[in-house]
Amino acid sequence: MFPMVTGFMNYGQQAVRAARYIGQSFMITLSHANRLPVTIQYPYEKSITSERFRGRIHFEFDKCIACEVCVRVCPIDLPVVDWRFETDIRKKRLLNYSIDFGICIFCGNCVEYCPTNCLSMTEEYELSTYDRHELNYNQIALGRLPIPVVGDYTIQTIMNSNQTKIAMNKPLDSRTITNY
């Protein structure tokens, strides 16, 4: 008879523990119920990206010395650098530079290790196309700067909740929103 009593006690303890776990999970669910929704109406509302966001790469053709450091540090050997050695000035001359963003993992190693800072990350993340071959950007397409989201009057920008409060008397421009 003694084992039967301990079995009922274990069953009772397990039932109380299960009820406590169910109650805790229900309280977590209720605490999330009164929060504002995170979703936004994307084409018309865009959230402002953080300062260290890794978007499309911007390339400045005039600064590049064709050293190919970006190719060596890239984990997938992605940037294609075509150059020719000019014997009269004894320097490399850059002919073509391209990056395929369909393959790029946006790690930022090329930007970090570039000795002349000719590569930089932009805040552009809208790279979707119907043809994957359109994601292969040459030096001309990489040299174009994206339109900033903050300055666009047709799009309502949604600020993240963890951003600092911006003074109401300051106009919204790209210099105002820097601390994320």
From Swiss-Prot:
Domain 4Fe-4S ferredoxin-type: 55-84, 95-124
EC number assigned by the record: 7.1.1.-
Reaction equations catalysed: a plastoquinone + NADH + (n+1) H(+)(in) = a plastoquinol + NAD(+) + n H(+)(out); a plastoquinone + NADPH + (n+1) H(+)(in) = a plastoquinol + NADP(+) + n H(+)(out)
Database matches in InterPro entries: 4Fe4S_Fe-S-bd, 4Fe4S_Fe_S_CS, NADH_quinone_OxRdtase_chainI, NDHI
A GO cellular component entry from the record: chloroplast thylakoid membrane
Domain of life: Eukaryota
Ligand binding ([4Fe-4S] cluster 2): C74, C104, C107, C110
Swiss-Prot/TrEMBL keywords: 4Fe-4S, Chloroplast, Iron, Iron-sulfur, Membrane, Metal-binding, NAD, NADP, Plastid, Plastoquinone, Quinone, Repeat, Thylakoid, Translocase
Cofactor binding, per record: Binds 2 [4Fe-4S] clusters per subunit.
Gene Ontology terms: biological process: photosynthesis, light reaction
Cofactor needs: [4Fe-4S] cluster
Membrane topology: Peripheral membrane protein
NCBIfam families on file: ndhI (TIGR00403), NuoI (TIGR01971), PRK05888.1-3 (NF004537)
Entry protein name: NAD(P)H-quinone oxidoreductase subunit I, chloroplastic
Gene designation per UniProt: ndhI
